[in-house]
């Protein structure tokens, strides 16, 4: 895991030099192991309007600065329903709501709060001979009470670019169906009030994963994630890293599932 941490730290330093302005106070950095587990259920709604739905359930656990166990504490539990419009070629539009129950973790400075999000998202996919590219823009507004009990309403803009490589299947009866190797980078900018946070930079995230089908209706993702988040004090970076797994059930069979919209992360 140390190699992953070093590589991610080097890449993040390059990104930071481009997206953060200089400050008098020095930056500090802490490393926190984490894990993300998710189960999704996708189902049709109104076919003639190209509408479908999806329900996501997510569990995020973490360690702390001096605790290397990514499963030590429960960070948050999430329920996230979506309505999806797929009437455009190569594009999907998503409208969603997220119910985030976050828990206190004294060692990491986390406090207990209930966070709700309203989300609008668009994903554009470009098919390639042996894979696909995708660009995703997500606008969400977060509603929660901060550690002082003050209510906060914070818009956040997220931009993701990803690549999927379709892997060959040489066996007549393979164990997994339509396997892929995927990876993406994602940048998140927050627009909070000055009394909460001065900086717009919020999170930079990287993820690499393997996806495949168990059956035409059940697909899974297994990978790793690394992300760097700026705390609201403007000088402390938390670097989260660890495993990510996801299982998706589609009521309608799918030949291939690449999990382009998976929301794997610890913030």
Which residue ranges define each predicted feature?
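Residues that define the transmembrane beta-barrel architecture of outer-membrane proteins
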Residues: 31-37, 73-79, 114-118, 151-159, ...
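Short loop/turn motifs that connect adjacent beta-strands in outer-membrane beta-barrel proteins
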Residues: 45-50, 90, 127-133, 167-179, ...
